[in-house]
Regions:
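PP2C/PPM family metal-dependent serine/threonine protein phosphatase catalytic domain
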Residues: 64-81, 120, 165-166
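Extreme N-terminus nucleophile/cap motif
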Residues: 1-59, 66, 150-166
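Short, glycine-/Ser/Thr-/acidic-enriched flexible segments
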Residues: 10-11, 72-74, 98-99, 141
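Short, basic and Ser/Thr-rich N-terminal targeting/leader segments
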Residues: 25-28, 61, 79, 128-130
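Short beta-strand scaffold segments in enzyme catalytic cores
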Residues: 2-6, 28-36, 68, 84-86, ...
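Acidic loop->beta-strand submotif enriched in PP2C/PPM serine/threonine phosphatases
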Residues: 73-91, 127
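Conserved beta-strand-loop-short alpha-helix elements that form
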Residues: 90-103
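Short histidine
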Residues: 100-153
Length: 166
């Protein structure tokens, strides 16, 4: 199971938590943040490189709204094109869970199929219903949970699950 993290400006998961998330979900990851002017993104098939990027840019990222994702591949190869978050006109989106309605489609990844269907529907959120957790960072840095019930990890930090803590 993957994990999604949203962190408001001034909040960030503890470094040990980020490391545990990456180790439990080792098939890639990414972080998207708003730098005050536009959205930025860093993704890599090695989740530890994502953790390293976050650590090396800690001062900047801690004070920006961030959407972080660590992937456990269930559908689709461990490959750069399957690392979340995915870019849309609405911002960057990340998914946690299996999108059962989208296991078959043009992509190996159920998430990529779901995101494509969401875009093609004109961003009708009913497409996302029942497909797991989905979070978005908008082009102006607003963090939104579109589906699922996030868990408060600590002040200002929400996660899609805590399975990585086991």
């Amino acid at each position: 199971m993957c994990v999604i993290v949203t962190a408001v400006p001034g909040a960030m998961p503890e470094p040990a938590d980020l490391l545990a998330m990456s180790e439990a979900n080792p098939d890639g990851g990414g972080v998207s943040w708003w730098d005050g002017k536009r959205l930025r993104v860093f993704k890599n098939v090695d989740g530890l490189k994502v953790v390293g990027y976050i650590y090396s840019h800690w001062d900047r990222l801690k004070y920006a709204p961030c959407l972080i994702h660590f992937r456990l591949a269930t559908h689709g190869a461990v490959a750069p094109e399957n690392c979340h978050p995915f870019r849309t006109e609405r911002g960057y989106v990340a998914h946690n869970g299996i999108a059962y309605d989208f296991e078959d489609g043009p992509y190996e990844s159920d998430t990529k199929n779901m995101v494509r269907a969401w875009i093609d529907s004109g961003y009708d959120n009913r497409i996302l219903s029942g497909q797991g957790s989905v979070a978005l960072i908008t082009p102006h840095g607003c963090l939104k949970w579109l589906e699922g019930e996030p868990v408060l990890l600590e002040r200002g930090v929400m996660v899609s699950n805590t399975y990585w803590q086991l």
